[in-house]
Amino acid sequence: FAFDLVDALAEREPDKLAMLHISKDKTERRFTFTDIKKESARCANYFKSLGIKKGDRVMLVLKRHYQFWFAMIGLNKLGAVAIPATNQLVEHDFEYRFNAAGVKAILCTADGDTAHQVDIASKNSPTLIHKIIVNGTREGWRNFDEEYSLFSTHFKRTADSPCGDDTLLMFFTSGTTGYPKIAAHNHKYPLGHFHTAKYWHCCERDGLHLTISDTGWGKSLWGKLYGQWLCEGAVFVYDFDKISKSKK
């Protein structure tokens, strides 16, 4: 997906809109597929510099931050396994997930109490090596925004690049009746959601689609990433915490 769709669209239509993002402070950002190609390459190179390699597990707790899309596609290019997670998790949730999946690194929002919960959980999570903060700073954490931007915007496909049956991502189930279970998906997974986007969401080429979901939920990947971009449409992302009737 990262090479065959994102990079290919960037080559074919460099100025094609991929995402319209509105932050909590109402800052508007427009990202083309060329932007996604370049920023995801920076991410792939950055993760590689940290010793993250094909098959390693990386958790993403990034709410609706635009950096999620950069990191997600970067991990796809590198072949590391992305594990999206919600910022509603607390210490014991993180500890269980870190150890069950063998998480090597986490990218975490600086918002709220989430990074503190990760710090507590990390004391009992021997596989976790890198804690990377996004949209802020924290003692003992790497600064994603400062560090990844120093890397090259070029990341080439190789004979060992991920594809087909290689693992793309992992979700944890809700754990309603027991401990959450891992649901793993391979690199064919995005193709299945072309139908989701085209026939359920009615996405169109050059259209703009809104899915409210936080990136920690499975809905975000089939509602605001894979299927929509396969339809060659853009996604609209509003990085909010709570909808207020008084705000416009």
Enumerate the language-model features and the residues they cover.
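Conserved AMP-binding/adenylation subdomain of ANL enzymes
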Residues: 191-211, 215-248
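Conserved AMP-binding A3 loop
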Residues: 29-34, 168-192
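N-lobe entry segment of adenylate-forming
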Residues: 1-31, 35-49, 54, 122-128, ...
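Conserved AMP-binding/adenylate-forming
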Residues: 26-31, 45-92, 213-214
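Conserved S/T- and glycine-rich ATP-binding loop of Class I adenylate-forming
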Residues: 58, 75, 106, 167, ...
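Conserved pre-ATP/AMP-binding loop-to-beta segment of ANL
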Residues: 14-17, 133, 139, 149-172, ...
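Adenylate-forming
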Residues: 6-10, 36, 40-43, 58, ...
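Structural core segment of the AMP-binding/adenylate-forming
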Residues: 49, 73, 77-147
